[in-house]
Swiss-Prot record:
Role of this protein: This protein binds specifically to 23S rRNA; its binding is stimulated by other ribosomal proteins, e.g. L4, L17, and L20. It is important during the early stages of 50S assembly. It makes multiple contacts with different domains of the 23S rRNA in the assembled 50S subunit and ribosome. The globular domain of the protein is located near the polypeptide exit tunnel on the outside of the subunit, while an extended beta-hairpin is found that lines the wall of the exit tunnel in the center of the 70S ribosome.
Protein name as annotated: Large ribosomal subunit protein uL22
Keywords associated with the record: Ribonucleoprotein, Ribosomal protein, RNA-binding, rRNA-binding
HAMAP family named in the record: Ribosomal_uL22_B
Gene that specifies this protein: rplV
């Protein structure tokens, strides 16, 4: 049995989020929370919330024990991009792309 949680349109680059997800993939849930708590990145705060949601889904919807859960899958996809323009000299305008992320965390019970 698996439980999942998804956070969509997080205003953060998928590249920066992916680095933090690599740290917790395959780890026990308690160990993953400890890693995220001491990781000094903005993405760690968001991933911590998504992981808490996935654990809550497992406990409440599937009645799984939180002590036996591990992070089986976690990945990030690119969300929609906000397009902005930065005015420059002599009437020019440069495009700024503000990327968003869709974060998915899946937890399973160890057999």
């Amino acid at each position: 049995m698996e439980a999942r949680a998804i956070a969509k349109y997080i205003r953060m680059s998928p590249t920066k989020v992916g680095v933090i997800l690599d740290l917790i993939r395959g780890k026990q849930v308690n160990e993953a929370f400890a890693i995220l708590q001491y990781t000094p990145r903005e993405a760690a705060v968001v991933i911590n919330k998504v992981l808490k949601s996935a654990v809550a889904n497992a406990e409440n919807n599937l009645e799984l024990n939180a002590d036996n859960l591990y992070v089986s899958e976690c990945f990030v996809g690119q969300g929609s991009t906000l397009k902005r323009f930065q005015p420059h000299a002599q009437g020019r305008a440069f495009k700024i792309l503000k990327k968003t992320s869709n974060i998915t965390v899946v937890v399973k019970e160890r057999a």
